[in-house]
């Protein structure tokens, strides 16, 4: 195997993550490597979090994010928690400042092992999300799936958490909707020039909701941190919930999201290590570390 890089297979509340240690290297994880890793059942993932040396003063590392289809992602809250857990275990440090495509993110590991990530501030302008046409109020945009007189899903809220999100509000069980069928259509709808993450959200109380997400570039996932943040912000904007909410995800885990008065959104949850190995960032060829072999 050519010059290899260490990696850890992890998950954040079921969101399948590969944390790749690219520090001290000039190369990048290629789309071909991402596709190869995702094609192997053992390393199948939703996002790769590639840790690079810092590019900006005041930050510890630059984190490049790739989806399972090889495309780039701006944000992944669950993946950032995995990065923090891996680095905290290595260094003993508890607080970190990262640079990502979405900007600067601060994160902290708590004494109980949970990790909080400051996901930054949401954006609501139609050009910021972005949308392909003007909407003066993105708390509800004109978009639906199904017949005009009996739509299956309609009138989502739109918000950016550094990446575009559309949240469809439903009263029935979120599992009763064919998100695997509608997700690709909505992700690639012309209204979203950069595609979008699609979430079905059911509010169960002013402090709780259940969500399912079709992730842009990854498909159906067991959890999506930025979608959880977008859902809470959108719910608070439309007076469905307060600004501090627990979310149950398809992976069975719970995320906590708080939209602070300073407009920053804090995502808190757990992260779990599965195994470690090494891989070729160019081809995706990989080997499991002996000590973590099953």
Swiss-Prot record:
One Pfam family from the record: DAP_epimerase
Site (Could be important to modulate the pK values of the two catalytic cysteine residues): 165, 215
Pathway connected to this protein: Amino-acid biosynthesis; L-lysine biosynthesis via DAP pathway; DL-2,6-diaminopimelate from LL-2,6-diaminopimelate: step 1/1
PROSITE patterns documented for this protein: DAP_EPIMERASE
First-tier enzyme category under EC: isomerase
EC nos: 5.1.1.7
Any single GO BP term: lysine biosynthetic process via diaminopimelate
Catalytic machinery residues: 76 (proton donor), 224 (proton acceptor)
Gene3D superfamilies on file: Diaminopimelate Epimerase, Chain A, domain 1
Gene Ontology cellular-component annotations: cytosol
GO molecular-function terms, A-Z: diaminopimelate epimerase activity
Chief location category: cytoplasm
Compartments, record wording: Cytoplasm
Binding site for substrate: 15, 47, 67, 77-78, 163, 197, 215-216, 225-226
Catalytic activity: (2S,6S)-2,6-diaminopimelate = meso-2,6-diaminopimelate
Entry similarity comment: Belongs to the diaminopimelate epimerase family.
Subunit text: Homodimer.
Function of the molecule: Catalyzes the stereoinversion of LL-2,6-diaminopimelate (L,L-DAP) to meso-diaminopimelate (meso-DAP), a precursor of L-lysine and an essential component of the bacterial peptidoglycan.
Name recorded for this polypeptide: Diaminopimelate epimerase
Source organism of this protein record: Mesorhizobium japonicum (strain LMG 29417 / CECT 9101 / MAFF 303099)
Name of the gene encoding the protein in the UniProt record: dapF
């Amino acid at each position: 195997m050519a010059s290899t890089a260490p990696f850890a297979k992890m998950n954040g509340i079921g969101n399948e993550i590969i944390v790749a240690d690219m520090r001290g290297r000039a190369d990048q994880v290629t789309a071909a490597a991402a596709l190869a890793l995702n094609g192997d059942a053992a390393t199948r993932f939703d996002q790769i979090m590639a840790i690079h040396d810092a590019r900006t003063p005041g930050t510890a590392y630059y984190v490049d994010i790739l989806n399972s289809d090889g495309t780039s992602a701006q944000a992944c809250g669950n993946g950032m928690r995995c990065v923090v857990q891996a680095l905290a275990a290595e260094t003993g440090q508890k607080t970190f400042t990262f640079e990502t495509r979405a900007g600067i993110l601060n994160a902290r590991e708590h004494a109980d092992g949970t990790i909080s990530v400051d996901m930054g501030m949401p954006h609501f302008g139609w050009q910021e999300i972005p949308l392909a046409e003007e909407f003066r109020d993105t708390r509800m945009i004109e978009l639906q799936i199904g017949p005009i007189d009996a739509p299956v899903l309609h009138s989502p809220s739109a918000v950016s958490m550094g990446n575009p999100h559309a949240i469809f509000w439903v009263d029935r069980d979120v599992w009763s909707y064919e998100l695997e069928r509608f997700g690709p259509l909505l992700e690639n709808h012309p209204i979203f020039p950069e595609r979008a993450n699609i979430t079905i959200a059911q509010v169960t109380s002013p402090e709780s909701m259940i969500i399912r997400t079709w992730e842009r570039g990854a498909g159906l996932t067991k959890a999506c941190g930025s979608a959880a943040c977008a859902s809470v912000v959108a719910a608070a904007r439309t007076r469905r919930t307060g600004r501090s909410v627990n979310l149950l995800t398809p992976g069975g885990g719970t995320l906590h999201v708080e939209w602070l008065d300073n407009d920053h959104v804090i995502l808190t949850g757990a992260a779990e290590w599965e195994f470690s190995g090494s891989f070729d960032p160019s081809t995706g060829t990989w080997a499991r570390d002996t000590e973590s072999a099953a």
